[in-house]
Amino acid sequence: MPHIPVPAAELNTRLDRLRCAMTEKDPAWSMLLLDNTLDMYYFTGTMQDGALVVTPDQATLFVRRSFDVAKDESAFADIRPMGSFRGIKEVYPDIPETVYVAAKAMTLQKLSMLNKHLPFAPKPMDGVLSGLRSVKSAYELDCMRESGRLHRYVIEGLAPAFLREGVSEARLCSEICTAIVDRGGMGISRYNQPAAEDVLGIASFSENSLRPTALDSPSGCVGTSTAMKSIGSSERTLHEGDTILLDIPCGWRGYHTDKSITFYYGELDKHPQSGVIRAAREQCITLENETASLLRAG
């Protein structure tokens, strides 16, 4: 059931942790304002056009669009409709000189719109936000584990059956992602970067998997066009002897797992470099296991 709301207790705990972290950062802090949808979802369980205002003793989600949807899907305690940012000042008449914001996500245009009604100097709180989100609650870990279970089932269990002579990169990627969405997946993944959303992922065959992209990733892709370096080519089709790189994430209720996997299409023993390919695979497995052994809390 992917549409189950984030529990109220979970949202309350996050708000308490936010206030504690802000007090540790600045004992004199008096207000913070978050306007981007990712922060809004984390603290309120809904993604709307609006702003979340938090003080040491009060928190209000102001929603321009859509207030009705926000009330329907969020367990956040105080959600109010907002015509413009002037509405914030009606609830919080004493706007402090300094207000903490997510500087990485707030645009100059949005800041100008806010300052038209709320004259304040912005101060960044990005470190606080990333620190809070880096420590997962039991609820968040459960979401990630469910994403991982779904991810593994589709990528490792179903994907090999989708490999067939003549299928294009784009078609293969879309079929795999459809299988994820059909089973409750989000159909999108998000990164901690401005405007960083990936609708599907990538499927790349042989030489295309070595094609560099602007994304901070080792996976290569020619994309659907020069304007879209993702998903894969609708022209490059699969043939015997190709390698298939799948770098397709999975999301569940706002939480993600990421995995890359490479398949070989055909009889590997017939490939002139079969020994090199097998050795490369074993080396990858060794590196993966060594890396996993280094992981520890903190």
Where would I find each of the regions flagged by the language model?
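Active-site neighborhoods and metal-handling regions in enzymes and metal-associated proteins
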Residues: 1-298
